[in-house]
């Protein structure tokens, strides 16, 4: 064996000598370029390189491209070249050494097989190329001969007949020789191709037999040790043909194309006639072959990713549908995986019409989903709210607290005067019109303990205020005037107290008046379930006089006695909670809320969550306007610092985190809006007809501003109750605080009148009012406001017309006039007859005609009127059937002004 030097080894492995010397040095072998390298050193170098550069990959992918050019004859004798590219790809997975050796041997066998096949294909392509060249030469020769033939034919016409015969014979001989030569060449080409195909087939069969035998032996020796991974073929192109079946399909397709080409060459006109059918057949063949190629190995290839993979479900799928408090129809349809039209159809069957974007409530959505066969899961969306409200310090021991007493009764029965005497102040004189229009909250220190009083309005408009007062109280003091007795608001106060489950203490006021009758009050109240203690009931009756101060101490004792029976207790230490008694917007201080603390201690700086609003308590004041820093149970306070004006009656709760309080307030606002939209089902079937029947109804638009929230509610409710079938009151805007430019602009846009109750318009609002000529009115007493709105509504009512008889004339005779026709000679028996007045003709007290008096004369003179007891001639317009004895009734139509009752 010849020695292998470093230089020869570098040339053999195709690398530079310097790099090989460096690699040998890295492997611990110091050599110069001329030194010899032993086999052991070569193995050490190979092991070093394997360690440095890592072993071979577990996967081996072979990609081959074979390009060839095929010359195909085209139309007009021209040949065109077609580029053919065959792409092949195969992936192998490395197993152990034996598997690698077997794989290498199998790969060598396959390469030999492919080499034989390629040689056969190349030989066939060369033969076809030679054949195409010969055919092209023959085609050119035939064209030349045809040209010569045409020239000879033209020449033959000019020459003699004997020359034409000689020329034709010569041409026929040449044509026959050319055809014989062509047939001979075609036979030779077919024989060559047949021999090449037989040789290739024989080699393939022999190689396949050898490969099968070798594979059988290797499978027996190394069973289960090597597998070929063909997974990569799934993602390869459709042109990748690696299986034996695919190669056979390609060969068959090539043979068919070649046969079609030859048939076109031989067929002549017949081939042209069958061109369409041949094209369709060859296209079908190509589609079939392409389908075979796509089949891959053993038909296991996956379908194309472009194919539709959806299969229609055999039956409806029942889903778990999660529904919140509100949901749109489109969202519900998506959760059930159905079309929105199906949900709308189901709702219409249930009697509700809805659009696809309409918000529906939880109950409706639950009914629809269950009707369509799905399981409903109701979701509670107020988890954050509950978590915030439950995270409070309320575990301290309860202590006795002062009672909260509400003074209720009919208007002008002396509620505020009674409370005045107790507080020793003059509050009643400060109220406009001498009536209470706000809830006043006061706490009074008596000899026997502290009492918190709430003074509610007695007017009918303040029903909601009285209801809030009854809910926030422990004891109700019902004030009844001894001279008036039980009145409508007295009965209403009894109903509120019973609904809230609050005990009653009856104060019979104005006992010092001569016409006072306390027994009458007891009898009337007993009809409504309020029985005195002396009659076996539970209600305490105390006779008082707010002016003279009679019985005040007895009333306080009765209140404290009732409080002891109730055993009122509250947690004093801890986070406070209470109820909003009243709220308003102060121009200098912002939103102000009067809060009655129920439990805990409200401190300055606490974070308060109140309905839709939240905020930090910036300042606290008592009912006298004094600054305080804390307020315990049963103490009413004014707090500043809320984000907006809370609604009266809202729960005020102290929480820990301002951020969470803001989230809860925003959630409540959103929920309120969604629920409001869900309940506005104007598209329901039962409402459609009522909307159509209403027709044209006059509307009185009003923008209302008041000083406190309770007054806004009371006035708005009273105004809405004034609506009739012909005129409706529509409050387009309402709020707490002064009249601003925005309010004036809204009134101008909606053609509304501006009403201010105990508030005034600012300078910018007044400018808009003057520019737009708006109707702006101020009020301080609710009676005046309601009366003027009634007058405005009366002006919008359609007028009524009344017919009033002004005169009667008896027909004595009838004569003719060439100008007016029949003229009735009459005697005025009653009233006055006026010209151009409407009349009725009565015959035997039955109206037979109604028209107009056209002509009125007395002694040939036209007159405007004829009085009682005088004769006249009357011409009735467009009526000539007047007879003696008829009565002509003259009347006027007068307008009667209507009012709102």
Curated annotation (Swiss-Prot):
Residues 545-547 are annotated as: G5. Residues 455-458 are annotated as: G3. Residues 409-416 are annotated as: G1. Residues 48-313 are annotated as: Disordered. Residues 509-512 are annotated as: G4. One of its GO terms (molecular function) is translation initiation factor activity. This is Translation initiation factor IF-2. Residues 263-277 have a biased composition (Basic residues). One of the essential components for the initiation of protein synthesis. Protects formylmethionyl-tRNA from spontaneous hydrolysis and promotes its binding to the 30S ribosomal subunits. Also involved in the hydrolysis of GTP during the formation of the 70S ribosomal complex. Coiled coil: none annotated. It comes from the Bacteria. Residues 68-82 have a biased composition (Polar residues). Residues 106-226, 278-291 have a biased composition (Basic and acidic residues).
